[in-house]
Amino acid sequence: MSINEIIIYLMVIFMILGAIDKIIGNKFGLGAQFEEGIMAMGSLTLAMVGIITLAPVLAKILSPIVVPIYTALGADPAMFATTLLANDMGGFALAQELALTPDAGLFAGAILGSMMGPTIVFTIPVALGIIKKEDHKYLATGVLSGIITIPIGCLIGGLVAGFSPIMIFKNLVPIILVAALIMLGLWFKPEGMIKGFTIFGKGVVIVATIGLVAGAIQQLTGLTIIPGIAPIGEGIEIVGGIALVLAGAFCLVFVITKVFNKPLMKMGKLLGMNEVAAAGMVATLANSIPMFQMLKDMDERGKIINVAFAVSAAFVLGDHLGFTAGVAQDMIFPMIVGKLVGGVTAVAVGIYMANRMMKKNKAKEQTAVKDNG
């Protein structure tokens, strides 16, 4: 039995435990987690099905522009899809359509698509809707720290998947270039960059909704609004598969949080964060939204470290696990390893950036005190 199969069986065991707990009245809290996993189907449908339905059409439109640029850089055009889109928000489907080789399609769809795409299309726009304005600078610094290590996470994830190192390095060229441009933007114009990502995120929601409605009309009436789209049933089947895995994954994360609470809190203290920040990092493994809701109660250092960690590591035991299990089971373990390596190395960069920021703030305070004196 492969490690990927072991992970699936583990999810199934926790799904069964969650279902039993739901039947007996949610005595242990697992029943609520089981229900939450199944209920995720609605929000996943809104985010994913439209883009999956439109993927063949988007590939046809984008290919003449993307293919020459990426092939000139020695990379596969599939990398373009998940530089901008999350794996579970249509990035995987678009990567498969654009891919020139199956390996590059999987590398882009399952590994890069669980790190770079989600940051741009989901993490930043969603975080901005939750966090306070005074925390924007911590968001920008955290995202900057996290993006620096995405190529490291992709490299390790690709090697664990057994892809050729030459193929990995070639395909990382455009990623490193895009990451460098984003980092420069966040360094010099953080507010402008963040605003740009938000507009892009809203644009993706519009396209996804159009795709969903066009697919629904075709399914229900037989009328083709957009020629060349994939049947909507394909996207709905993927979403259903993800929800089944999430029913187990959410139960697993719930148990991990309960059992390993003390050691995880100790780890937070070692990193120099308060307890809320340590809890935020644990929550991020399933979903980054609760972490962003807790951000206001974290210390400065904890805010930066949490956001940095979330860039690669968010959803590793949540949506991204569910999605990968549904579309490419062989990529489960490489995806988990890649995301965790990206997240842990981002924490190291985040600590450095936080120390730098806190030193600057201290120097400013001392100057202000001297001026007042």
UniProtKB/Swiss-Prot annotation:
Transmembrane intervals: 5-25, 38-58, 61-81, 111-131, 143-163, 166-186, 197-217, 236-256, 307-327, 331-351
Entry-linked InterPro entries: EutH
UniProt GO cellular component terms: plasma membrane
Subcellular location field: Cell membrane
Catalytic activity: ethanolamine(in) = ethanolamine(out)
Primary site of residence: membrane
Disulfide bonds: none
Molecular function GO terms recorded: ethanolamine transmembrane transporter activity
Domain of life: Bacteria
Keywords for the protein's UniProt record, in alphabetical order: Cell membrane, Membrane, Transmembrane, Transmembrane helix, Transport, Virulence
Gene ablation phenotype (knockout): Decrease in mouse macrophage survival 2-5 hours after infection.
Membrane topology: Multi-pass membrane protein
Entry annotated with the keyword Transmembrane: yes
One Pfam family, short name: EutH
Family statement: Belongs to the EutH family.
Function: Probably involved in the diffusion of protonated ethanolamine (EA) into the cell at low pH. At low pH most EA is protonated, and this permease becomes necessary. Contributes to bacterial survival and replication in acidic macrophage vacuoles, but not to bacterial uptake by macrophages.
UniProt protein name: Probable ethanolamine permease EutH
Lineage summary: Bacteria, Bacillati, Bacillota, Bacilli, Bacillales
